[in-house]
Amino acid sequence: DLIVTGVQTCALPILLKAHIGKNLFATTDPCVAASQDVVVFVTGTPVDEHLNPRVNDVLKVISSYIKHMNKDQLVVLRSTIFPGVTQIVENLLASALGSCKLAFCPERIVQGKGIEEIFNLPQIVSATTDAAFQEASALFSAIALKVIPLSTTEAELAKLMTNAWRYLEFAIANQFYMIVEKQGFDFYKILSAMKDDYPRAKHFASAGLAAGPCLFKDTMQLSAFHSNEFFLGHSAMLVNEGLPNFLVQQLEAKMGCLKGR
């Protein structure tokens, strides 16, 4: 319950009321996959204690559904996966089903704006076969603003790079925040002056906690893909994951010892 009570868009209650029990159903029964034309997996790839991707977590979920699937279905992967995993999933499905139609079409929406953005953002579409690409393109052309074709590995990298880029953006803002606040100045006053009618600073991020479910792990996955030589990503990790400790130190400087408070 704590997970599913997250941010809701304003249109969500209206849409749920209109569709639940009619053309929208929720179930934990994997058998329902057998009767579907399209099966979409939204299992993200976590990282382990060594910051390496746990690819088997994704494969285990897909494997648990295979006995309910068939070769005529379009299978779509939506969540972040390590580069090359789409091909591994294709081999897994083909081995069990004889052949498959597999696409990787990464979701690009931001939390709290899902309904708005799924219609207004372009959708990257990649697939392991022409038939799968055509079906996936038709599916998302009915929803998204436009379809952008990539190879599966290009699409996997695009998803990781997008999230790593955002993580780096937040790290820059957080580093500046710590530099300024440590010296007793107001970061947001300075940031406001920087952005005031100055187009090149228009998209400068605000400081803030950047852990979340995606950005950190996807930055580390990109690093793992590059033999752990993504030095900007590692520096961003030190900044972003170090911000909570900085905030506690700032509180202690103002309030004294926080033990027991």
Residues of each region from the PLM?
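Single conserved hydrophobic/aromatic residue that forms the stacking wall/gate
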Residues: 1-10
